């Protein structure tokens, strides 16, 4: 199976179910809470793996506890994390997500700190049958989509706003 190279963001989401979304500078109590994997690319890679496909994820993480949680969770889901870049001293991305009784949500995201901006490592990916890139890391998306064009395989963009329109150039 050729599989899919997925390039982009991987995070941990701390999800809190609340009666109403926070609106005042005070403490709120959650009805329930859970810690789940998140991020456009990571979610796509998990979906591919759960459907029986091969997913190789290229994402940028710190060498911190959050990064370790992300890699362990993705590994349990069957995602190949060999391309995940762990930067010494960097901090991985995570979010607090509040979901009210109507299903509306608020997300507070920490995008990470000190993560590598280098994209050359993406070219070390094994040849795959398709490439999916999210726009939360536009430089990585551009590099991954160029690789898809080089391989002659579909390049798909998960274009979550805000995005750099230049990332769409390599999509097919």
Indicate residue ranges for each PLM-predicted region.
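Short Asp/Glu-rich motifs
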Residues: 67-68, 92-94, 166-168
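Glycine-rich phosphate/adenosyl-contacting loop at the front of the ribokinase-like
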Residues: 1-60, 65-68
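Catalytic-core segment of enzymes that process non-peptidic bonds
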Residues: 60, 93-98
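Positions that flank functional sites
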Residues: 63, 89, 163
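Residues at the start of alpha-helices and the adjacent loop-to-helix junctions
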Residues: 33-37, 88, 140
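Short glycine/serine/threonine-rich phosphate/pyrophosphate-binding segments
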Residues: 40-43, 66, 91-92, 140-143
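Ribokinase/PfkB-type carbohydrate-kinase core domain
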Residues: 1-10, 56, 72-86, 98-172
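Short, basic and Ser/Thr-rich N-terminal targeting/leader segments
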Residues: 51, 77, 90-93
């Amino acid at each position: 199976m050729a599989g899919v190279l997925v390039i982009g963001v991987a995070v941990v989401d701390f999800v809190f179910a609340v009666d109403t979304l926070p609106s005042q500078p005070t403490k709120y109590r959650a009805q329930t809470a859970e810690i789940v994997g998140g991020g456009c690319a990571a979610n796509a890679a998990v979906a591919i793996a759960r459907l029986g496909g091969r997913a190789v994820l290229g994402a940028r993480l710190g060498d911190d506890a959050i990064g370790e949680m992300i890699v362990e969770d993705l590994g349990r889901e069957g995602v190949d994390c060999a391309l995940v870049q762990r930067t010494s001293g960097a901090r991985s991305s995570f979010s607090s997500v509040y979901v009210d009784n109507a299903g509306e949500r608020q997300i507070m995201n920490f995008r990470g700190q000190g993560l590598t901006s280098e994209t050359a490592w993406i070219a070390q990916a094994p040849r795959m049958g398709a490439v999916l890139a999210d726009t939360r890391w536009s430089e990585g998306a551009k590099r991954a989509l160029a690789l898809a064009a080089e391989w002659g395989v579909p390049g798909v963009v998960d274009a979550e706003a805000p995005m750099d329109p230049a990332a769409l150039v390599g999509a097919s």
